[in-house]
């Protein structure tokens, strides 16, 4: 019988789909990896399961442990799903500016939500989570997605291998937004190991260009541009960085839905905008550009991305 023992067994093996109308007249082929096919509707399901599994194997958590994590949303949803399935209590700290849908989803899975000031960004959410662990070290466990090696490792073992397998090794360029840095690190390292000439492109908000050496700043591209260089990010793995404006990210996310029938979030818009610029360049003629799209657009209906549709 083809019956999964748990919802977490359905994480991974997400599909690749070619963009058609958005790439008309461009020199390269662009394929997008749809991470919203994961059961929690985002790429973060992968690291949520990996971090909880790692903590279980290391004996760091038990049924009395309260798992606490700082997250801009999708990691929280992934953790909430995994914790619900495995019977753990979960508390999530997140900036108050995150979308209404994400907050409701977390509560729907039974997670406790602790909101921090928007102006403090992810750094404020992380500080709050750490303060809870420091105050109750025997009760709280923090997976620390920005520092946890299980984050890039699950992308080495799963995401990268899926891309290599599904493109028959023909991938030439990999594009991903950088939040924790786990995806671009894990996927980039493996693809370059298999095919050293693969180019890896990091995407960050123009309004918070920390990877490019600029100043951090507030921006609406949820999930990327944390405002600091995460521990798990291998800053040597990407060949170039694309800075994307808020407007370009929003417009491209809307265009993906309207022209390709693929409903995605804001950071997916940023990543595809970057890929489309690359696809225009003569040196990429005939090449295959793979773009990771982290999450589903329905999670952003209350944000400025789709707010004017109401």
Swiss-Prot record:
Indicate which residues the UniProt annotation says bind pyridoxal 5'-phosphate: 74, 179-183, 267
Q: Which residues carry this modification: N6-(pyridoxal phosphate)lysine?
A: 44
Biological process (GO) annotations held by this record are:
cysteine biosynthetic process from serine
Q: What is its EC number?
A: 2.5.1.47
Q: Which cofactor does it need?
A: pyridoxal 5'-phosphate
Q: What class of enzyme is it?
A: transferase
Q: Which residues form a coiled coil?
A: none
**What pathway does the UniProt record associate with this protein?**
Amino-acid biosynthesis; L-cysteine biosynthesis; L-cysteine from L-serine: step 2/2
Catalytic function, reaction form? O-acetyl-L-serine + hydrogen sulfide = L-cysteine + acetate
Q: Name one Pfam family in it.
A: PALP
Entries under NCBIfam families matching the protein? cysK, cysKM
Indicate the family of this protein: Belongs to the cysteine synthase/cystathionine beta-synthase family.
* Other facts noted in the record for this chain: Present in outer membrane vesicle formulations which are used as vaccines in human.
This chain's protein is named Cysteine synthase
Species source reads: Neisseria meningitidis serogroup B (strain ATCC BAA-335 / MC58)
Q: What is the lineage of its organism?
A: Bacteria, Pseudomonadati, Pseudomonadota, Betaproteobacteria, Neisseriales
Q: Which gene encodes it?
A: cysK
